[in-house]
């Protein structure tokens, strides 16, 4: 079973100097999404899952059109949930992130004050992933090894989500110990895609990271993070 993970295109995080919660795409982001759709237009997927957040839905729209696919919109795919900073000056939000990064390592697991903890986020993503893959015949083995059972190794699943979500999925599928900055370990630009592929190991299957953040469909001047 191959898993293709798309990160949403560039969102409009700031409008007139103020932060926007659950933002739409920028004009450049919409162009990025169209180019992504052109890149993947001739691919086939057995299942498509899309985050319910606006930036993911708008990124998925041209892709779903060219694929002729019927998606499942999944709220478990949402990004790490931050406090609602709508209307807060963007400089204040930047300062909050700067302070958060300077915290003691153990405090990073708590997330931002008023938002979702990384512990809760990691549990939401991994449990949602396993529950969604099980009907497709893919689920973890019962032992302590990071191996999977796969009924259909040729199945292909497309996910349109977020940097944190996709990085957490990658780490979980690879059996890597989680850290509360997963999105910094696996860097993915806007409207890029990553690919996980299975390989037989003993009596189970292990996944390899075949591609990470492929953005070859975007010229350099259109690549954003």
Regions found by a protein language model. Give the residues of each.
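Active-site metal-binding loops of divalent metal-dependent hydrolases
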Residues: 9, 163, 213-215
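Acidic, low-complexity terminal tails and accessory targeting/binding regions
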Residues: 80-91, 138, 146-155, 171-225
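GST superfamily/GST-like fold recognition
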Residues: 163-167, 192
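Short glycine-rich phosphate-binding loop at a beta-alpha junction
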Residues: 45-52, 140-148, 156-160
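Loop-to-helix element that buttresses phosphate recognition and phosphoryl-transfer chemistry
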Residues: 4, 10-63, 114-128
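Short glycine/proline- and acidic residue-enriched helix-loop micro-motifs
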Residues: 98-123
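Beta-strand elements within well-structured catalytic alpha/beta cores of enzymes
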Residues: 2-6, 151-161
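Phosphate-coordination/substrate-recognition cap region in phosphate-metabolizing enzymes
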Residues: 35-102
């Amino acid at each position: 079973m191959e898993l293709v993970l798309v990160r949403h295109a560039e969102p409009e995080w700031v409008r007139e100097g103020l932060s926007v919660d659950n933002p739409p795409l920028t004009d450049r982001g919409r162009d990025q999404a169209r180019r992504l759709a052109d890149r993947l237009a001739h691919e086939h997927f057995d299942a498509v899952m899309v985050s319910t957040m606006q930036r993911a839905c708008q990124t998925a729209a041209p892709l779903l059109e060219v694929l002729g696919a019927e998606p499942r919109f999944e709220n478990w795919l949402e990004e790490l949930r931050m406090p609602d900073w709508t209307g807060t000056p963007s400089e204040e939000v930047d300062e909050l992130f700067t302070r958060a990064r300077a915290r003691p390592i153990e405090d990073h697991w708590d997330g931002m004050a008023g938002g979702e903890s990384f512990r809760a986020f990691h549990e939401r993503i991994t449990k949602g992933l396993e529950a969604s893959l099980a009907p497709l015949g893919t689920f973890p083995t019962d032992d302590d090894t990071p191996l999977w059972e796969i009924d259909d190794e040729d199945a292909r699943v497309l996910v349109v989500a977020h940097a944190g979500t996709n990085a957490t999925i990658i780490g979980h599928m690879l059996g890597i110990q989680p850290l509360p900055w997963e999105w910094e370990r696996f860097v993915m630009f806007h409207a890029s895609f990553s690919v996980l592929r299975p390989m037989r190991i003993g009596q189970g299957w292990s996944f390899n990271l075949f591609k990470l953040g492929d953005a070859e469909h975007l010229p350099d001047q259109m690549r954003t993070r």
